[in-house]
Amino acid sequence: GGSPELLQKQRPPRPPEGFSPFEPGPKAAVRPTGLYENILRRVAPYGVRGVIWYQGESNVDRRNEYAALLTAMIADWRSTFDKPELPFYIVELADFLSKDDIGGRQAWAEMRKEQAKVAETNRNTRLIRNSDLGEWNDIHPLDKKTLGQRAAESALETDNK
């Protein structure tokens, strides 16, 4: 509890009217969809055989939305490249955080489940195991070679079918 005056004092100041965390302008790469419009759309006319998707660390706090968002992105990219069966290889989040950080580790485990759900429920998608390569103190595992081999084997196996 507390008085409305006290709560108002504790609230962080509002950003100025018109403030945006993104660079202004239609070509700003850091605005929402900026990377898509400035990079991906430009390579769409070229041949692509598959996509290795290694992302998700920054979405752990919104993990309940992740499966739907990634599924929509996969459908959109397949449409953009005009390849309805474009393979997607989803790299599982590596294990991360100290064994003592039970809440954080639980959140990462739930995120891995969301990634697996996407691979299980979307055609021509695969999950590339990575949870065994993580380190408690580094969000980006040092063992890139093993992960690279797994990704290559998965892609080659799909490509050779």
Regions found by a protein language model. Name each.
Residues 1-161:
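Cell-envelope and extracellular/periplasmic
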